[in-house]
Amino acid sequence: MAYREVFCRDNGFEHVSRYVQGLLLSANKTLQGIYAQIVWPEGEQVSRRAMHAAVFEAGWSHEELMRTHRRTLAPQYRGRGRAVIGLDWTLAYHPYSEKIYGAKPAYDYVHRCWSCYQTVVTAAVANPHRVDGLAAEVQPPNYQKAELAYLAVTQQESYEQMEQVQTRLSELLHYHQHRLGDRKRTEMAVDIVRQLEAEGDYPQADYAFDQGVLTHALTTLIESAGKHWVSEIERTRLVLWKGQWQQVQMVAEPLRKDHPESFRHKKVRCRNGEMREIWAFSKVLRLKKYGRKRLVIIHETADLSDTPRFLLTDALHWDASRTFATWSFRWPIETFHQFAKHLAGFEAAQLRNQEAVKRHFCLSCVAQSALQQASCQGQKSERFEFADESQQPIGQRRYSLAREAVQQVVE
């Protein structure tokens, strides 16, 4: 009941609760599909339009919901091992409609066809036991090219009537407003971190991300909060090596060939408890814009024949083991993406309204966390005999929720 205070009315809260449950249990995770599977008590059925209004149009705030969500999750990450916040972005595919908010056409290199997708910037916190989404922000659509083309086509050499001048000025101001309102993925990531640090629910959590969101503004903000970060960098990044600016790949190759002994063998315990062997070279170097940072070059084979991984951190006192162990917390956010897309309806909502899309992503995060907290049944079932006593698979949790839902219908 921690989320009840977010909603104005009991009926609205009940509709949202049904929607979250439907995101986990319904095969069709749209509101239409969820509503179609609800078994209403006699005399209590409401229209689908009423449920739609309660979930997507009522006066509750998705921002307040996520603040409550983050505050509710915070105790789960205290005293249960190290916690690290991961930052990333993902694509939510909508191949059948360009009218969904934020969906834009692009070529899908996986399926080798044109498709539509939303760009969603996410943040997730992870410890050795679980991973939870903390933020999901959809990138607003960018229509600058179309608007600029329209302005070029409708341009006139002179305007005889004041009404024409006012109309043209209004069009130019709208274009300027949209241009200023355009937000890059990296800017959205900075805003998310600023919000997380302002709330202060995860004071001990460092950050891990890759070069897709790495910017000077982001690292400066994290460092100003007294925290550390680890990021993978591209192999063409320039570093100051022996008095000259060189690409990190040009630094790594001579080291591998001429001084293989500089790569120290280490055994690192990763986030999931797995022990991994690495061969690492670590040194504090200077980078353009970022200043002095620790560079760690990682190989995972003893003969150094694999492609190296280049990690960068502001923690100058960390060794290669600590840096790589922190970097292992970057991958749970990929698990969160898969989890949310396949089990919590991240890509299911066919909504054209900006507020409705944001609410759906927030409720998907809530559903993903709710599933991890569900109590388990059926330990002695043959279906789950592969799991030991300490494991509680996601399938078993969904099985428990489905049984509870059926039991409520029967009763």
Language model region names:
Residues 7-15, 110-116, 351-361:
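Structural motif
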Residues 17-23, 305-331:
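Extended, non-catalytic structural segments that build the interaction scaffolds
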Residues 346-403:
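Basic, amphipathic alpha-helical segments enriched in Lys/Arg and hydrophobic/aromatic residues
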Residues 164-294, 382-388:
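An internal, acidic/charged active-site-proximal segment
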Residues 54-155:
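Active-site-proximal, Lys/Arg-enriched surface segment
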Residues 34-35, 51, 81-95, 123, ...:
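Short, conserved catalytic/metal-binding motifs centered on acidic residues
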Residues 89-91, 319-351:
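Short amphipathic alpha-helical "interface-anchor" segments enriched in bulky aromatics
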